[in-house]
Regions:
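Beta/coil-rich, acidic/histidine-enriched accessory regions frequently appended to metallopeptidases
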Residues: 51, 224-298
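Structured segments of extracytoplasmic/periplasmic soluble domains
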Residues: 56-63, 121, 141-148, 196, ...
């Protein structure tokens, strides 16, 4: 989750850290500050958590998205991860609330929040009108990046999409993405936009390129340190793939509500609900597209 009214948060971030350390991941230097009352051994667990998450994001984008990052962990007395925020600036900052009683599985296996917040770093800081893209992109890329890094199985990511993306469909009276700012439309509607764009790019390029290459092209010249024009940013992504996929889809969906047939989409991708889980049909029409989305790019 991004913060646009971040002055108060910036004041909180300036508090004296309890423990701090630095690590480097694929071109990025990350400072980790622990605040609160972290128990013995928690600093090492936190470092492993940040490093593993950063490596997944770097794998997806080809490098870590920004040269410097400050990670502030507010350590409480419980367990688990309780949400995060990403702040723009010359040195972007991520603030996450986490329980000091978290075990390695909580942070290294179950958590998705750290990767989600780091994905924000690879795209320009956007105004509220385009928050659906910022959050939807983080939802979508976080899932695919974790699959490509081997953190989760593809069945988990696609199962989440099948279960949650219907929340992103427009309701009666809704407008396009720029007019309806509900939680479901912002997070899961935005993620649906990204999946559809990924498929569209791959259809335009005979499955040679996808959204991942478009986003790498954007991150090569822009990132979360600055606010940039949204349509210009999409044009950069389109140039990276030699298509107009992002622009065309944005123009189709920004003002008018569009209701894709998700059941037909899953069928085409070969994603099938079976026995309480997800199975894949490798003979489906778009099965090769789904497999390409899941596969790391060199």
């Amino acid at each position: 989750m991004q913060r646009r009214a971040f002055l108060a948060g910036g004041i909180a971030l300036a508090a004296t850290p309890a423990i701090s350390g630095t690590l480097t991941v694929d071109g990025g230097t990350i400072t980790i500050d622990l605040r609160g009352d972290p128990p013995p051994g928690f600093a090492m667990l936190a470092e492993n958590w940040v490093r593993k998450s950063a490596a997944a994001v770097a794998l997806y984008y080809g490098r870590f998205p920004v040269p410097e990052l400050a990670v502030r962990l507010i350590v409480g007395q419980d367990g688990g991860v309780h949400g995060g925020q990403t702040f723009p600036g010359d040195v972007p900052a991520i603030r996450i609330r986490v329980g000091g009683r978290s075990d390695p599985a909580d942070l290294l296996v179950k958590d998705w929040v750290m990767v989600h917040e780091m994905v924000h770093l690879a795209f320009p800081w956007l105004d509220l009108q385009h928050n659906w893209m910022a959050e939807g992109l983080a939802v979508y890329v976080e899932s695919i990046a974790r699959v490509q890094a081997g953190h989760i199985r593809p069945q988990q990511a696609w199962g989440d999409f099948v279960k949650m993306m219907p929340r992103g469909l427009p309701h009666d009276g809704d407008g396009g993405f720029e007019a309806t700012l509900s939680h479901g439309r912002t997070y899961w509607g935005g993620a649906m936009f990204c999946l559809l764009a990924d498929i569209r790019i791959r259809q335009y390029t005979d499955n040679r390129l996808g959204l991942q290459q478009a986003l790498r092209g954007i991150n090569a010249v822009r990132d979360f340190r600055r606010q940039w024009d949204f349509e210009e940013t999409l044009a950069i992504g389109d140039r990276a793939t030699g298509t107009h996929a992002l622009r065309d889809q944005y123009m189709e969906m920004k003002d008018q509500p569009v209701t894709p047939d998700l059941d037909a989409l899953w069928h085409g991708l070969g994603v099938m609900a079976r026995d309480g889980g997800i199975a894949f049909d490798r003979n489906a029409r778009l099965a090769a597209v789904r497999e390409a989305i899941e596969t790391p790019v060199s």
